[in-house]
Amino acid sequence: MEFEAEHEGLTASWVAPAPQGGKGAEGRAGVADEAGHGKTEAECAEDGEKCGDAEMSALDRVQRDRWRFSSPPPHSGVTGKGAIPIKGDGKAIECQELTGEGEWLSQWEELPPEPRRSGNEHLDESRYAKQTERGSSTGKEEGDGMKQMGELAQQCEGGTYADLLVEAEQAVVHSVRALMLAERQNPNILGEHLNKKRVLVQRPRTILSVESENATMRSYMLVTLICSAKSLLLGSCMSFFAGMLVGRTADVKTPLWDTVCLLMAFCAGIVVGGVDSGEVESGETKSESN
């Protein structure tokens, strides 16, 4: 496939053969112009010498640029994707387009221009414009860019960072799935192995567990208060009705006897209420233990 250089006006130098000499000798010999009018032999020689020197200097530059920017040899390892593209400051590269970077850097002192396909297929104009503006960079920046590019080329041989990241993510997902499957199938065996592997197994206290404990304590205190109020109310009622019944049956007019009966009924009510509350509390402890 034919490539075009189009770098600093060197399109002709990409395909043209190396110059085999200039026109300075012909100028010095006094060759006249094509028309052959209005000039003597000395004037023709002088003009030809000046023109020949100018053309020789331009051709020397073209020959030098041709040596620097010519296409890579067939054994260099560079495929049809072309030379190594440079972005922005000349330091960032694309790993997927590095094919023969080692041999290329060993044979060429500078990076060649980015070639363009003859049909302009898949052409990124902005990247090419940035690449053509690279002429203002200094030699030190170019050396640093080549060194960094060599390091990135070595890293790209074993896979890019994206590939390594994807492999790590897949390994983590696989490990989590295997752990979940083992915990579902054999939770006891898994717990035993974990207890053997770990020095101290502690279950961390989360915010949810702390709030649950606080709610349990509040509910327990509320139940205890309700049971105590129930016992007091029941004892008071029993003592009141027992005092009325005992007072009518004995038919005693003394207030001392009424007071004694009232105290006895009150004590009996307290005892009955305490037994009732104890049964409730024992039932709660059994439910909590279960």
Curated annotation (Swiss-Prot):
Post-translational modification: Phosphorylated.
Signal peptide boundaries: none
Cell location: Membrane
Keywords associated with the record: Membrane, Phosphoprotein, Transmembrane, Transmembrane helix
Statement: the UniProt record of this protein carries the keyword Transmembrane helix: yes
Chain residue ranges for the region called Disordered: 1-49, 67-87, 111-146
Membrane-topology annotation of the record: Multi-pass membrane protein
Basic and acidic residues bias spans: 34-49, 113-145
Transmembrane segments: 226-246, 255-275
GO cellular component, one term: membrane
Main location: membrane
InterPro entries: Herpes_pp38
Note: Expressed in both lytically infected cells and latently infected lymphoblastoid tumor cells.
Entry protein name: 38 kDa phosphoprotein
Organism annotation: Gallid herpesvirus 2 (strain MD11/75C/R2)
